[in-house]
Every structure is written in C-alpha cells, then in structure tokens.
Amino acid sequence: MPMTTSTPARGRRVALLACTALATAVATVAGAPGAARAQAQPPAPTGGAARPRQQPPAPGTPKELRLPTKRVLTLDNGMHVVLVPFGTVPRAYVQLAVRTGMIDEARDGTGLSQLTATMLDQGTATRDARRIADEAATMGGSVSASAGADVTNISGEVLTEHAAPFVTLVADLTRNPSFPADQFARVRTDAIRRRAIAMSQPGEIARERFRAVMYGDHPYARLYASEAELQAYTPERVRAFHAANFGARRATLYVVGQFDAAAVERAAREAFASWSAGSAPTVNPPKAKNARSLTLLDRPGAVQSTINLGVPVPDPSSADYTALEVTDALLGGSFGSRITSNIREQKGYTYSPFSQVSTRVRDAYWAETADVTTDKTGASLTEIFGEVDRLRREAPSAQELRGIQNYVAGIFTLRNGSRGGVASQLQFLDVHGLPDSYLTGYVGRVMATSPEDVRRIAESYLAPERMTLVVVGDKKTVEAQVAPFARTTP
C-alpha cells in the first residue's frame, strides 16, 4: 500500500499489531486463512425452538479514495507548496519535505543526514532550542525533524489559527539552523548511545547486514555509522551537509487540515521566496544484489535466531506494484498471511514474523523477517521458502484472496484518514513521480488483482534462488541447519 520511504522493521511490526483487529475482522468475514471462524452465539431459549444461528453481515464493497481538493503553488525558486483543506477538527498538519537523506551521504558520512535533521530544532540565528519548543507548544503542538533514505521531513501539528506562524517557524529551522556546538555535542552523544542500543539487538544487526549485502557500496547499504565515525563528526561537517543538500528545488511544503489558506500562502511566500534554489534532488538507483547469498552472524548462546531474507522487486512506478503489495499481504505481510499462519500458528516456531515491500526512489525490495526458536532455524527456512514456492506454483483461491484484498483496501483507507496520513500519501506520489490517480484508483487495482496475478507476481519476482539471506544466531547450533540454504538451483 502506498507509503513514503521505507520504515524500520520495528515500525512495521507496530503497524501490524495496530491493525490486528481489522485484519481479524476482515479475514473472518471473507474467509482468509488463519482467521478465527468461531462466532459467539447467544444462549438458546429455555423453552421452544432454538433461535436461528446469527451470521455477520456480508462485507461491503471497498470504496475508492476521494482525494481532498488540493491547491499546488510553485514559487519562483522552484519550491512547491501544497494546500489541502481536510476534515473538521480545528488543527493543521504542516510538513516540509526536503529531498535529501542517506542518498546524499558520502562513504565517510554515514548518519550525517539524521544528525543534520536532529540539529534543525536545536537553534537558529534568532531562536534557541528552548524558544523553538516554547513557540511550538504555544501554538498547540510541537516540531520534529527526521531523515530517511531520500527525504528529510520537518513537521508538526498545531491549532488552526497558528498554521501560518508555524509555517514561518518551520522555515526558520530549515533555512537558518545555527548548529550550536553545545547542542551538537549532546545530539552526537545521543546518536552514539542509540547506535550502541541498536547493535545489541539482533533484529537491527540482521537488518544492517541485509542492507549491506543487498546494496554493496551504495549509500542505501549503510544504516549505522561506527562509533569512531560519529565521534569524528563536528558542527562544521553537519553545516556543510546542510549547505550542500537543502534548497528550494528539493523542497515541498504540505499543509493539511483546517487553516486560513490565504494566510498560509502569504506566510509560505514570505518565508521561502528568498531561499536559494540549490541543486536538484539526487537520483541514484542502486544495483541491488540479485543472487542467493547466505550470511551467518554468530550470537553465542542465543535462544532465538533472527532471519532476514529478501529480493529486489519493482518499485512503485511499475504497473505490477499494487499486485505485488497484495501478494506480500497474502504471503507474509498480514496476520492472516500464509507464512505467519504456518510458522506462528501451526508450527509455533516464532511469535511475530512479517514481510514487507520496502521502497526508496527507483528501488524496492521484498523481505521476510522472523525471530525463530534456535533449534527450528532450518525448519523455519524450509517452511518460508516452501510457502514462497507454493505460491509461485499455485494461485490462491478466490476466497482467500478476497480476504486479503479487503484487508489491504481497509488499511489503505485507514492511512488516509488523518491529516498526517494525507500528507504522507501526497509525498509518496511526489517522491515516486506518480499521478493523483495512483491513489484514487488504488482500491480498484487491489480488488481487480486476480488469483493468477498473485501467482504470476510471486513467480516473476520472488524467486528463492535470487534471495539474500541473513541469519543472526548461535553459530554452533545454527550453522549446520542453515548450510543447505547457502546455494540453490533454479
């Protein structure tokens, strides 16, 4: 389903857990595998004939998204402003998206994009960190910044009457950061601490190595800087990254919710019109690894093995992308999926396996992740690859597919139900160069996906012999189990 750039595994897991109720309800109605089919029945009357068994109502037909009317402005310096009236709650969501992130990091600059983003609200030429936080709080909100693979977002949500001044505040943070040395030292220390925590978690260790194997020397391969690299960074290094990669040609301002459009437009023009255009966004698609490899990382004494396996797939510009998302949901990307039903519900090898399609600009991969019992590592891989192979050979039933289609369409609807969700979806279109019809026709494409489409997608793109496989676990226990998966014959 449409998203912005890729989310970490933990975020995906939280999203899946949040949607459990919806997935179960949809699967139950539509007969998806793994669904709880038992219905609570009222007690029979003490006398006379029993009441007829109650049945849930038939599922409704998912409806297409009606994209809110938007107004798009282009300033003389190339910056875009997108104004979207939405909802009735008197709040406005403001998001400035700048097309920079990991993609612009040099080999000796891993993590600079996130350090730069974190420093944006730590002080400007006219505001210190305390004043920035206080101003945002006075407007009924807060401001934050984060960097991803291709986009850095500066965003916040405020009361309707403060939308225009909040735009002015966001402009100051983006255009005039001062990168104060005392705040930088604290932010860098926090980054070192977060890195240490991440490198103690097998899921992050596996994800980092998976990306490194998949992308080689490309910036997308480098998720974490070393502690030595982080220690060596200075405010001057971050300032140079900002100067090179922040500019109007790379920026789009999204304002979604209830707001005074004339006041917001005026504020945007006043705050951003004099911003230098800067360079065009970097577009550098990777040459992702497309052949089987196995990496085993030793974690002595571990009672679980963490599995990451995946393969390059078409990006959102492909005509097959929506069907690929449906295929992912059926195979491993939902709680009613085949892999989850197999290794979680039936076998009990794991608690929370999941798969996803992860996207960047002109790039995507499909990946399955699972933390499995150590002595069932090989058996888990056998089952995962077995489910992939089964779907490549045999189309799912129409009934099974319909449950998944309803799930995917339902999640899509939920994602478009908030101000931030609408902004993220519009950003997704812009980052991937897609028309509005991509969103307004999404549900129709989901529901039009046929069982044979799913089988064809799996056969075409999810070939086990092309998959990158990373396992983090107790080598003495796991090595012999995973050895047969090092190579495979098509």
Name these PLM-found stretches:
Residues 27-44:
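Signal peptide processing junction and immediate N-terminal pro/mature segment
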Residues 39-63, 252-255, 370, 402-490:
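C-terminal regions of mature proteins
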Residues 42-58, 217, 252-315, 471-490:
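An aromatic/glycine/proline-enriched structural segment found at the starts
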Residues 44-55, 166, 198-247, 268, ...:
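Scaffold signal of the M16-like zinc-metallopeptidase fold and its non-catalytic homologs
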Residues 59-97:
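Mature N-terminal segment immediately following signal peptide/propeptide cleavage
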Residues 93-160, 200, 222-224, 334-349, ...:
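M16/MPP (pitrilysin/insulinase) zinc-metallopeptidase core fold and M16-derived inactive scaffolds
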Residues 122-126, 156-188, 334, 354, ...:
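M16/insulysin-pitrilysin zinc metalloprotease superfamily fold
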Residues 133-138, 178-196, 260, 279-292, ...:
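Acidic/histidine-enriched alpha-helical segments
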